[in-house]
């Protein structure tokens, strides 16, 4: 299907639709429904600006319901610069988003339509997204997320991150969460409750331009492995209590 190496390297945009019809100009189409009964269809069309590239469409009547295991969904889509969810991608049953966008070429992503209330695993969700400059989270629910390892690892184009929507009470691993985000200058962790985090190893390692992180009153490192937490970073202070 569209996860074949050829398409993963040549798809430039992804759009979710609320119907499962395939247009006549589709180069190739696939039944990507779990039961293989045609409920979810994916197809590619040559891109208007570059006919050697493709636009991917994924559709189902009333929108696509994501599989509970949505790991690697767009992993390695090295040419994808845009993903249009259009409120047609229901993530309410998803439990793992492990490496969901890893190595994708997206520059911006809007996750305001995502329902992540059941997700427990966001390990390397955006890992190695070197072109990613902006993430819009909205009311992003992380209250059940246990694993945030490498979530933003090697996101070298990110300059700011506002994670004030994050609830981290159940999170145990933040290892390498921001590791090698070399252009990150500002990160807001005001909502982070880290009392159950057991590892923060390499959390900010290699953040060579990050000087200040802002945390709230529920930030603590007392239960965590903090080896190399700030190794190679520019962090000069952890600012507590300026969370408004």
Regions picked out by a protein language model, each given a short descriptive name:
Residues 1-244:
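Negatively charged
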């Amino acid at each position: 299907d569209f996860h074949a190496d050829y398409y993963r390297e040549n798809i430039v945009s992804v759009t979710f639709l609320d119907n499962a019809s395939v247009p006549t100009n589709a180069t190739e189409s696939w039944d990507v429904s779990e039961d293989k009964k045609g409920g979810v269809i994916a197809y590619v069309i040559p891109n208007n600006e570059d006919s050697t590239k493709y636009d991917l469409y994924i559709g189902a009547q009333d929108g696509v319901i994501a599989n509970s295991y949505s790991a690697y969904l767009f992993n390695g889509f090295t040419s994808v610069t845009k993903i249009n969810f259009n409120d047609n991608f229901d993530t309410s049953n998803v439990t793992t988003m492990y490496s969901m966008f890893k190595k994708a070429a997206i520059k911006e992503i809007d996750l305001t339509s995502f329902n992540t209330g059941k997700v427990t695993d966001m390990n390397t969700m955006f890992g190695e997204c070197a072109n990613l400059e902006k993430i819009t989270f909205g009311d992003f629910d992380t209250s059940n997320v246990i694993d945030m390892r490498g979530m933003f690892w090697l996101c070298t184009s990110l300059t700011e991150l506002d994670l004030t929507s994050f609830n981290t009470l159940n999170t145990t691993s933040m290892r390498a969460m921001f590791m090698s985000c070399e252009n990150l200058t500002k990160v807001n962790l005001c909502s982070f409750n880290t009392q159950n985090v057991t590892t923060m190893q390499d959390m900010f390692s290699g953040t060579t331009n990050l000087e200040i992180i802002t945390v709230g009153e529920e930030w603590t490192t007392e239960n965590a492995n903090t080896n190399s937490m700030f190794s190679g970073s520019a962090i000069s202070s952890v600012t507590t209590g300026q969370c408004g």
